[in-house]
Amino acid sequence: MLENIPSQSTMIELLGQSLFEVWQALCSAIDEKYDMERLWNTGGKNWTYEYKYRRGGKTLCCLYAKSNCIGFMIIFGKDERAKFEDIRDTLSDVVCRQYDEAKTYHDGKWVMFEPTNADEFDDYVKLLAIKRKPNRK
């Protein structure tokens, strides 16, 4: 867990104003549907920060930030991959391509999106619903 949570100005400096707005919009889209614990961490060797959504010890998704770049990761387990295939026809080509190109590990398929705008957010919400039903009315 991160001791010093980055301020809004730190995030704007890191991402740039337009990507910071995308970051905020993505967080809002998730917060609107899910009441989750949110944890800041260091971003490992590839990212500056990790912002994880989890509940009951299970991770829903993670957002990552580094200089002028946002990452949005969802890990799909075996059953969740089958559910993805069930809704594939409702998703954009961009989202399907990212999914298809993602590496599958022993614990799941790690799909990293790098949004630059809100165009795919509706699809992201559908993907999150595969992981967990929204728990906000």
Predicted regions and their residues:
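Charge-dense, helix-prone N-terminal extensions
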Residues: 1-137
